[in-house]
Amino acid sequence: MYLTTRLAIALFMGVGICWSSRAEAQKIEGVCFSAPRNEVGDSSIAQVQSIGANWICLMPYAFARTEDAKVRFHPDGGQYWGEMPAGISAMVRMAKARGMKVMLKPHLWLGHGEFTGTYVPDSAIGWKAYEQSYQEYVLYYAKLGHGIGVDLFCIGTEMQAFVQARPIYWNKLIDKVSDAFQGPLTYAANWDEVANFPLWDRMNYIGVDGYFPICAKDRPTVAELEVGWQQHALELARLSTVKERPVLFTEMGYCCTADCAARPWSEDPEAPRDENAQARAWQAFFNVYADKPWYAGCFVWKWFADLPQDEARRGNGFSPQGRAAMNVLRKEFKGQ
């Protein structure tokens, strides 16, 4: 669908979106919990709620070796407490007791550091193993999510090549997940995949992992970062209108580094640490998106439920805990 520049600007400004009042009333202000190794209590949920978050995202991981393409997960043992049914169920109960909502987001890791977005098996045997085992993995957690009252289920994370190569499989998988979960669905598209994901019509939200490169320089100002966001925001507004779905940032985050806006997906432990650069990047994000009616909300990548803030603050990774970025999140989530 062709949109004129004038209409695109109107969409970016939030004009004429039919779900505006509904989206404004239900903004998702969430955090992605890094699955805790050991059992955690209500204080972990309370800490997140203290910054104004109203959702958490739980991520039970699976693992695959490219040699055989089989997706492996171990819900009966062998994974972290926060990835197993007992841990997931406990965290859902604690969140619900505090009036919060939960997204369940199965997340696949590949061996040798390979990116899931470009991986496809290299044989018919590999494809069969990949498809069958991924379906078992996703359906297991869809059924679990339904049973424990999860509010939103994510069917996949950054799997562009798989989706593009096997659209019939994914349509059938969505049918099965819909039957098992019986609730709203999304898919977490990588930032460079979101415009071409073919199945948004079957999702309730356009999900995007929002690691868009927005400024190549070190320590940019908030104003410079806002300029870097403009084209991406226009494209997301256009997509939202065409697909008639709100946009949810299923992951959104910046490392605590001077160049965090240049390659936001990249984590470099040797990069210069800069809390203020991380905080400015977050502030620019909210300045651009928070008042757009097609913006459904975001999940902050990421939050360590089992670490004290002082420990989580160390290094230069994504966590906002104990850093200047946490103050930005608190201000924006609480509307202060």
Go through each PLM region and give its residues:
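Aromatic-rich peripheral "rim/lid" segments of glycoside hydrolase catalytic domains that contact
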Residues: 264-267, 279-281, 288, 292-336
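Aromatic-lined carbohydrate-recognition surfaces of secreted/lumenal glycan-active proteins
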Residues: 104-108, 154-163, 171-195, 244-252, ...
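Boundary/entry segment of secreted carbohydrate-active catalytic domains
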Residues: 24-50
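The substrate-binding groove and active-site-proximal loops of carbohydrate-active enzymes
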Residues: 30-35, 71-85, 123-133, 156-165, ...
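Catalytic-core region of carbohydrate-active enzymes that cleave or remodel glycosidic bonds
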Residues: 184, 225-294
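Bacterial N-terminal signal peptides
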Residues: 6-18
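Substrate-binding cleft and catalytic face of glycoside hydrolase catalytic domains
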Residues: 54-70, 85-163, 257-259, 301-306
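Aromatic- and acid-rich polysaccharide-binding/catalytic face
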Residues: 138-157, 189-229, 246, 250-258
